[in-house]
Amino acid sequence: MLKDFSRSMRLERSLYKEIAVIIQKNLRDPRLNSFITITEVKLSYDLSYAKVFITFLNYDDKKNIKIILGILQNATGYIRSLLNKKIYLRIVPKLFFVYDTSLINGIFISELIKNI
């Protein structure tokens, strides 16, 4: 028998969807000219913190990655206020944006395998 999804997994999925919509439609910062993709959301055990793993196209240098992460981190209050209107929680988790390197690592490994 399949195990039912836990509350934290359901909440991670809801946060994943809502944060993606908020970033694409509600953030109007001109410095965010890249297509930002959320790859995963991980909640802490007590549901008070959420790590949002993101990746974006055409920005491989660390300087631009830091700039975009800083912009998103500064917008967490606004994002949390919009989340509070869409997802009914007693406490909306504090958001921490982290650049996800799994895509770059996967491309690197694929290139290594191709060159063998």
From Swiss-Prot:
Keywords in alphabetical order: Cytoplasm, Ribosome biogenesis
Single GO MF annotation: ribosomal small subunit binding
PROSITE patterns assigned to the protein according to its UniProt record, in alphabetical order: RBFA
GO-annotated biological processes: maturation of SSU-rRNA
Subcellular location: Cytoplasm
Keyword Cytoplasm belongs to the record: yes
Cytoplasm listed as a keyword: yes
Gene Ontology CC: cytosol
NCBIfam families in alphabetical order: rbfA
Job description of the protein: One of several proteins that assist in the late maturation steps of the functional core of the 30S ribosomal subunit. Associates with free 30S ribosomal subunits (but not with 30S subunits that are part of 70S ribosomes or polysomes). Required for efficient processing of 16S rRNA. May interact with the 5'-terminal helix region of 16S rRNA.
Family to which the UniProt record says this protein belongs: Belongs to the RbfA family.
Subunit structure: Monomer. Binds 30S ribosomal subunits, but not 50S ribosomal subunits or 70S ribosomes.
Protein name per its UniProtKB record: Ribosome-binding factor A
Lineage of source species: Bacteria, Pseudomonadati, Pseudomonadota, Gammaproteobacteria, Enterobacterales
Name of the gene: rbfA
